[in-house]
């Protein structure tokens, strides 16, 4: 139960930070480009890399991974987990697997979004 609470608390913080960052970028740059989404994805990727480096050195343990990696970064951006998956594949020398995963994730997510929209429009 303690692990779940760490993830939930981190998720609340990450989601709140994403909301505030999105509002700030909207006010600063306007609605013409998704600067907020791009920003959280880039920040999340950097933060995930920093966290993994700390974890690999043994400077933090499982509670930090759950709170920060799964919780905060999961709430801030799921793109950070995706980026970590791709990096791990590349480090294992699985270039084609990584490229396939990137294509399937990005294209598949957009296709799934349109499928969801289509379903909802047909029942509206």
Predicted features along the sequence, with ranges:
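Membrane-interface helix-loop junctions in multi-pass transporters/channels
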Residues: 1-124
């Amino acid at each position: 139960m303690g692990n779940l609470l760490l993830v939930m608390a981190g998720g609340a913080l990450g989601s709140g930070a994403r909301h505030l960052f999105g509002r700030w970028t909207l006010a600063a740059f306007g609605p013409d480009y998704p600067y907020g989404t791009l920003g959280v994805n880039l920040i999340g990727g950097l933060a995930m890399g920093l966290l993994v480096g700390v974890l690999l050195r043994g400077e933090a343990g499982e509670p930090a991974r759950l709170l920060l990696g799964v919780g905060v970064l999961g709430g801030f951006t799921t793109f950070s987990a995706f980026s970590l998956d791709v990096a791990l594949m590349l480090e294992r020398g699985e270039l084609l697997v990584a490229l396939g995963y990137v294509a399937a994730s990005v294209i598949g997510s957009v296709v799934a979004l349109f499928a969801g929209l289509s379903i909802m429009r047909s029942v509206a």
